[in-house]
Regions:
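AMP-dependent adenylate-forming
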Residues: 3-25, 43
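Conserved AMP-binding/adenylate-forming
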Residues: 22, 37-83
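Conserved structural elements of the adenylate-forming
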Residues: 30-38, 160-168
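Active-site charged/polar residues at nucleotide-handling catalytic sites that mediate phosphoryl
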Residues: 47, 94-96, 117
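Conserved S/T- and glycine-rich ATP-binding loop of Class I adenylate-forming
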Residues: 52, 69, 100, 144, ...
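Short beta-strand elements of ligand-binding domains
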Residues: 56, 79-80, 102-103, 118-128
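Conserved ATP-dependent adenylate/AMP-binding module captured primarily in the ANL superfamily
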Residues: 81-112, 130-131
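Conserved pre-ATP/AMP-binding loop-to-beta segment of ANL
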Residues: 131-149, 155-156, 166
Length: 168
């Protein structure tokens, strides 16, 4: 397990974040991110740094998805909810994302690329559904955790890779 995620257990009853006027504890975040990880893994043992993109507004779900991707061994690729379709397509193609988790508010925006890109498109509601808890892989701090995109002042945006050690 990733050390900072392990530390969340020590604060399980404390408020982790407030989203849409509702408080969520670290335990809520642990439980929901375990569910996300289990759904992503399905019958696999480790995502082995597969890129998992997600387009979700800032919320409890955003954090649970990001943590769940990490717990499953994937690389989180957060997409900006304000970007137009061509920019989103560019990031998905550039990162070679295998999966895209989509909040219902962005389904219509992304629908035109469903047939064009070889991605597993997962509605947010599906990834948050209860699933048998998987045995989560051990994640070394040297593994890649996230790809964030810069604003691209000289051309197209550039992906910046962050490891778990960088986040720690």
């Amino acid at each position: 397990m990733i050390p900072f995620l392990n530390r969340a257990v020590n604060f399980s009853k404390r408020t982790a974040l407030i989203s849409n006027g509702k408080s969520f504890t670290y335990q809520d975040l642990i439980d929901q991110s375990d569910m996300v990880a289990s759904n992503l893994l399905n019958s696999k043992k480790d995502l082995k740094e597969a890129r998992v993109a997600f387009i979700v507004p800032p919320s409890f779900e955003y954090t649970a998805i990001q943590w769940g991707i990490w717990k499953a061994g994937g690389i989180a690729v957060p997409l900006c909810v304000l970007h137009p379709l061509p920019s989103l397509r560019y990031v998905l193609e550039d990162t070679q994302s295998e999966t895209l988790i989509i909040h219902p508010d962005y389904w219509e925006l992304l629908e035109p690329i469903f047939k064009e890109l070889a991605l597993d498109f997962i509605p947010l509601t599906n990834i948050l559904k209860p699933f048998r808890k998987a045995i989560l892989p051990d994640i070394d701090l040297s593994r890649r955790a996230m790809i964030l995109y810069t604003s691209g002042t000289t051309s197209k945006p550039k992906g910046v890779v962050t490891t778990h050690a960088n986040i720690e």
